[in-house]
Curated annotation (Swiss-Prot):
The organism of origin for this protein: Streptococcus pneumoniae (strain ATCC BAA-255 / R6)
A Pfam family reported for this protein in Swiss-Prot or TrEMBL: PrmA
NCBIfam families in the cross-refs: prmA (TIGR00406)
Family annotation (HAMAP family): Methyltr_PrmA (MF_00735)
Task performed by this protein: Methylates ribosomal protein L11.
Compartments reported by the entry: Cytoplasm
Protein name: Ribosomal protein L11 methyltransferase
Enzymatic class: transferase
Length: 316
C-alpha cells in the first residue's frame, strides 16, 4: 500500500495563502487549512460576528506528499523562501512537523476540511467532489481545494467576492490580476461579466485556474494567461480585481488607472492592517477615489472608483 507524508506548518494567519501556494510549488498533492475561523459556521451575510469563538492568531497549513518525496528538503526550501519574504509579511514563528499516513488516510484527511460554504449573499463554493443542489438564486462555484491558491474561504478572498457582488451589474469586462485558483474570475462570470481576463505570474497557478474553470460550465468567457501584473496589457476594463500582497498592489495602481474605464472600479484585497495606508495612498495618487473599505480581522480590502463625480465616494 502506498504511504503518504503529512507536513504541518504552523504560521500566523496572514501567511495562509502564501504558505499554501509555496507548498504546492514544492510538490504537495493537496493542502488543507486548520483555522479556528472555519468553525464559526457558514454565513450568508458578509461581516457577521461570532463572539463565542475566539480567533486564534495562528493557523496550520497541512500539505500531503507521497513517500517518494524527501520532506526534509521541502522543509528546508520552504524555510529559505519564507526567509526572503520577512520584509513583506510577519509570519511569526514558523513551526513544521511531519507524520506518515496510509493512502486511505490521506484521501480522507484533506477532504474532511472542505464542505460547501455560502460566502456571500449569492455565491456558494462547493468542493469538486460534492453533489450540491443550489437554492433559488444561489450561484455555485466548483473548486478543487486540494490545489490550494485560494479556496474562497480566506478573508481576503471573501471580501473580494463580496466586492465583486456589489459592483458587477452585467456585461462588464473584468481583469483578474494574480488569479490563483481562478475563483474571482469564475465568480465574475457567474455575476454577469461579459469577458474576464485572468493573469498570474506563476505557471502552476495558471494551470490550476484553468482546471478549476473547466469544473464550472459556461466559463468560455474567461481567458487565462501568464502575466506580470498588468505589464503589457492593453485591454480596457470596467473592473480590475487583485487579491495579492500589499507590497505588490502598490506597483499595480498606475497601470490599473490607465486601463480602468471612467466610472470603473479597482478592487484590492490581501492587505494586512499595517499596510493599508500605503495601499490607499498609492491608489489615490494614481487618481482613484475610495468608495468602500472593508476589514475582517487583520485583513483589509477596498473598492476604488475612477470618477470625476466624488459626491458618492468616501470623503467626497
Amino acid at each position: 500500500m502506498e504511504t503518504w507524508q503529512e507536513l504541518k506548518v504552523t504560521v500566523k494567519r496572514e501567511g495562509e495563502e502564501l504558505v499554501s501556494n509555496l507548498l504546492i510549488e514544492l510538490g504537495a498533492q493537496g493542502v488543507a487549512i486548520e483555522d479556528s475561523m472555519d468553525y464559526m459556521g457558514n454565513v450568508d451575510r458578509f461581516g457577521e460576528i461570532f463572539p463565542e469563538v475566539e480567533q486564534q492568531e495562528e493557523i496550520v497549513v497541512t500539505a500531503y506528499y507521497p513517500d517518494t518525496v524527501d520532506v526534509t528538503v521541502v522543509e528546508a526550501d520552504l524555510q529559505a523562501r519564507l526567509a526572503e519574504l520577512t520584509d513583506f509579511m510577519d509570519l511569526g514563528e514558523v513551526k513544521m512537523g511531519t507524520t506518515a499516513l496510509a493512502e486511505e488516510d490521506w484521501a480522507d484527511n484533506w477532504k474532511k476540511y472542505y464542505e460547501p460554504a455560502r460566502i456571500t449573499h449569492d455565491l456558494t463554493i462547493v468542493p469538486s467532489w460534492t453533489d450540491y443542489e443550489a437554492t433559488a438564486g444561489e450561484k455555485i462555484i466548483k473548486l478543487d481545494p486540494g490545489m490550494a491558491f485560494g479556496t474562497g474561504t480566506h478573508p481576503t478572498t471573501k471580501m473580494s467576492l463580496f466586492a465583486l457582488e456589489q459592483v458587477l451589474r452585467g456585461g462588464e469586462t473584468v481583469l483578474d490580476v494574480g488569479t490563483g485558483s481562478g475563483v474571482l474570475s469564475i465568480a465574475s462570470s457567474l455575476l454577469g461579466a461579459k469577458e474576464i481576463f485572468a493573469y498570474d505570474l506563476d505557471d502552476v497557478a495558471v494551470r490550476v485556474a484553468q482546471e478549476n474553470i473547466e469544473l464550472n460550465p459556461g466559463m468560455e468567457n474567461i481567458h487565462v494567461a501568464a502575466g506580470d501584473l498588468l505589464k503589457g496589457v492593453e485591454i480596457e476594463a470596467d473592473v480590475i480585481v487583485a487579491n495579492i500582497l500589499a507590497d505588490i498592489l502598490i506597483h499595480l495602481t498606475d497601470d490599473a488607472y490607465r486601463l480602468v474605464k471612467d466610472e470603473g472600479y479597482l478592487i484590492m484585497s490581501g492587505i494586512i492592517k499595517d499596510k493599508w495606508d500605503m495601499v490607499r495612498e498609492s491608489a489615490e495618487s494614481a487618481g482613484f477615489f475610495l468608495e468602500t473599505h472593508m476589514v475582517q480581522g487583520e485583513w483589509n480590502a477596498c473598492v476604488f472608483k475612477k470618477t470625476k463625480d466624488i459626491s458618492g465616494v468616501i470623503g467626497g
